[in-house]
Amino acid sequence: MALYITEECTYCGACEPECPTNAISAGSEIYVIDAASCNECAGFADSPACVAVCPAECIVQG
């Protein structure tokens, strides 16, 4: 199941460069995750890298 970013996103940009599948991009007001591209960092890390760096803790399970 893919992750998604909630409205609590502060648009800081910390998550985007952490994504190994380039599933995260800047939306109009918050960052967004492309569910078709997100694999929760399987094969790259033990847990989702974006979740680990998000200061607003707004990246959650979809």
Curated annotation (Swiss-Prot):
Binding positions ([4Fe-4S] cluster 2): C19, C38, C41, C50
Keywords: 4Fe-4S, Electron transport, Iron, Iron-sulfur, Metal-binding, Repeat, Transport
Listed cofactors: [4Fe-4S] cluster
Signal peptide bounds: none
Segments forming domain 4Fe-4S ferredoxin-type: 2-28, 29-62
Gene3D superfamilies listed in its UniProt record: 3.30.70.20
Domain of life, per lineage: Bacteria
One Gene Ontology MF term: 4 iron, 4 sulfur cluster binding
Binding site for [4Fe-4S] cluster 1: C9, C12, C15, C54
Cysteine disulfide links: none
Keyword Endoplasmic reticulum: no
Cofactor binding: number and manner: Binds 2 [4Fe-4S] clusters.
Its job: Ferredoxins are iron-sulfur proteins that transfer electrons in a wide variety of metabolic reactions.
Protein name: Ferredoxin-1
